[in-house]
């Protein structure tokens, strides 16, 4: 595990920074939509922000998988197709830490420590996951989704799933569209050239 963290700490930090940047972007768009009191626009901007975030993660995880492909083929690295999901899970560890504090606040509301730490964690989580804010303010059962502790455990799942799939595709050099991989070499440049 130590080697894994050493080899992929940069990737985890990059994914976390992508999350923070897109959270700011999404939060700003949602606030603008809420200012004009337009629920449809709020939901659409939130979905757009989430998709944009997932595309960034897809590109990053695919590149990691593609870079690992050679090491796996040469036997220098083990074939671990779930490595992308694990990298994303580690990058989302802070989100799950917030979720645990929010959960403890929900089940132990009379314990002052968990109430205060859970409140702070919820405020930070709402901001750190700003791309989901437009959806989380929708009411279900008389309360917004961000009032339910389970929401904070569900939010990181799309990122983990996308990174897992993208890493697997990168590891096997599977491309579904050229949009995501414009900077990759063409197939003709990937094969070693023979010298005559």
Task: Name these PLM-found stretches.
Residues 173-196:
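Short, highly charged, low-complexity non-transmembrane loops/tails of multi-pass membrane proteins
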């Amino acid at each position: 595990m130590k080697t894994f963290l050493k080899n992929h700490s940069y990737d985890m930090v990059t994914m976390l920074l992508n999350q923070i940047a897109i959270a700011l972007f999404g939060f700003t768009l949602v606030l603008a939509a809420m200012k004009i009191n337009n629920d449809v626009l709020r939901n659409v901007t939130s979905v757009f922000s989430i998709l944009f975030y997932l595309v960034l993660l897809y590109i990053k995880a695919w590149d990691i998988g593609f870079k690992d492909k050679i090491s796996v083929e040469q036997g220098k690295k083990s074939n671990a197709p779930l490595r992308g999901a694990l990298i994303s899970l580690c990058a989302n560890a802070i989100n799950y830490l917030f979720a645990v504090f929010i959960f403890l606040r929900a089940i132990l509301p009379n314990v002052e420590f968990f109430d205060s730490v859970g409140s702070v964690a919820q405020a930070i989580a709402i901001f750190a996951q700003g791309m989901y804010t437009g959806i989380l303010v929708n009411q279900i059962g008389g309360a917004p989704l961000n009032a339910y502790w389970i929401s904070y455990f569900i939010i990181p799942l799309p990122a983990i799933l996308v990174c897992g799939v993208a890493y697997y595709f990168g590891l096997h050099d599977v491309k579904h569209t050229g949009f995501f991989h414009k900077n990759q070499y063409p197939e003709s440049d990937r094969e070693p050239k023979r010298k005559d």
